[in-house]
């Protein structure tokens, strides 16, 4: 019985280590094929789980509401923004190819839901992660280095609106 538990636990650790290794290699290599796998997994699984609490008080992730470039449909995507001066910095692990990034850049504005508050944001600009790294918490700096994140989206606070 104990052997089975140890073997099962060892198998689980191996599986999780392999998945994390793939994720790190995919993100650092910027291989379109590997990033596509990660993006599809996140869109179909991880994002759905994060969206259950994203944007609520105390949640790790926030929500960015953005309008589709072609359809005009409002979409919601979980993001992890960091306050910086008059706005926020959001890491772009997939670069500027993520649909939400393209939508925000095209519209020039969006809405960020953080801690239960909807905040209008505008003036989006892509900045080098190197240029803003000192503005991020140390833990986030390590995470960005590990995953090879080299771009961030800087947005400005337009005005704060009522609680969501």
Task: Show where each model-derived region lies.
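Short beta-strand segments
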Residues: 73-77, 117-120
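Mid-length scaffold segments of soluble, non-membrane domains
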Residues: 74-76, 80-85, 89-100
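Short, structured beta-strand-loop surface elements
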Residues: 95-161
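Short amphipathic, positively biased membrane-proximal segments
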Residues: 1-59, 63-76, 87, 103-109, ...
């Amino acid at each position: 019985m104990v052997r089975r538990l140890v073997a099962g636990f060892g198998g689980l650790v191996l599986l999780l280590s392999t998945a994390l290794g793939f994720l790190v290699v995919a993100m650092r290599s910027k291989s379109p094929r590997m990033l596509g796998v990660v993006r599809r997994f996140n869109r179909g699984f991880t994002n759905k789980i994060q969206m259950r609490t994203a944007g609520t008080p105390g949640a790790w992730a926030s929500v960015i509401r953005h309008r589709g470039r072609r359809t005009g449909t409002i979409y919601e995507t979980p993001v992890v923004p960091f306050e910086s001066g008059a706005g926020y910095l959001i890491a772009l692990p997939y670069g500027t190819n993520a649909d939400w990034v393209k939508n925000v850049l095209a519209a020039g504005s969006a809405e960020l839901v953080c801690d239960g508050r909807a905040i209008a944001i505008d003036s989006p600009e892509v900045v080098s992660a190197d240029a803003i790294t000192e503005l991020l918490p140390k833990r986030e700096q390590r995470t960005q280095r590990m995953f090879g994140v080299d771009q961030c989206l800087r947005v400005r606070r337009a005005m704060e609106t009522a609680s969501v």
